[in-house]
Amino acid sequence: MDGLIIPDLPPEEAKNLRQAAGRFNIVTIFFCAPTSTDERIRANTKASRGFVYYVSLTGITGTQKALAPSVVKQINHIKHFTQKPVCAGFGISTPQQVRDIGSAADGVIVGSAIVKAIYQNRASRDLVGNVSRYVSSLVKALR
């Protein structure tokens, strides 16, 4: 394990965790959200090690049909506060979304959509192949 991402844990409440993680060379990664103030962005980018995680939508993770037009603008705004990579995730599931986010973010995080692809292919003899082709379509969107 290289890092910890703990939702809903702000840096000011994570002092002991950050110290313990640091002793084992484990990075702590904090979130910035569409609702984050500049003060919160400043605190979270300063406290993050490894990268900053931008939550590309409000609400819970999963898939969404379209990204808010402000996502790229917000990622660029966060980059004014840090030299660390800014990666974005939550609700990303299509090659077009990966392409759009990838135009600004240093990394694109896809989680729930891959879990969904595994679930949808759970009875298939080619589960690994089907999921691999899906993931490859996302990766290809970045090239």
Per-range role (PLM):
Residues G3-I5, P10, Y54-G62, G91, ...:
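Glycine-rich phosphate-binding active-site loops on the catalytic face of alpha/beta enzymes
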Residues M1-G3, A20-I29, A47-Y54, A104-G107:
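Glycine-enriched alpha-helix->loop->beta-strand junction motifs that scaffold or abut catalytic
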Residues V115-R143:
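C-terminal helical cap(s) of enzyme catalytic domains, especially alpha/beta-barrels
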